[in-house]
Amino acid sequence: MEIKRVGTQPSAKGPSDWFTGTVWIDPLFQAPDPALVQGASVTFEPGARTAWHTHPLGQTLIVTAGCGWAQREGGHIEEIRPGDVVWFSPGEKHWHGAAPTTAMTHIAIQEKKDGRVVDWMERQ
């Protein structure tokens, strides 16, 4: 058994190549080999969001605070709130972030394939 204590891993500001606005990433866990899963708590300030991206093995978001938006390519922008769970299928192009006037925090869970968990694309 291994316990990861809250606050033992430093917060990191989301890189401007991958995010618009201010985003904070708090690593939660990265399972040891041979497991592939990892997770982070991500906080988006009002209006902040990800660039378009995909995940080779999909992604689960669990909204924990605030109000946000998520959109898949070709779909409508969907409002997401605390308690909502969002699943993006492997290779599904999408973005997610805070609503224009409200911050949003979610836990993001994804798995590595060939050493990567995400493929970043264009920003809007």
Roles of regions detected by a PLM:
Residues M1-V37, V117-Q124:
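A short, N-terminal "cap"/entry segment at the start of jelly-roll beta-barrel domains
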Residues W24, Q38-H55, P90:
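Conserved short histidine dyad/triad with adjacent acidic residue
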Residues S41-E45, T54-A70, I109-E111:
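Short, conserved beta-strand element in jelly-roll/cupin
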Residues T50-W52, A70-Q71, F88, K93-P100:
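Short beta-strand His + acidic residue motifs that chelate non-heme Fe in jelly-roll/DSBH
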Residues T60, W87, T101-W120:
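A short hydrophobic beta-strand segment most commonly corresponding to one strand
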Residues G74-P90:
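Short acidic-glycine-tyrosine-enriched beta hairpin
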Residues I77-E79, G97-T102:
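Beta-rich strand-turn-strand
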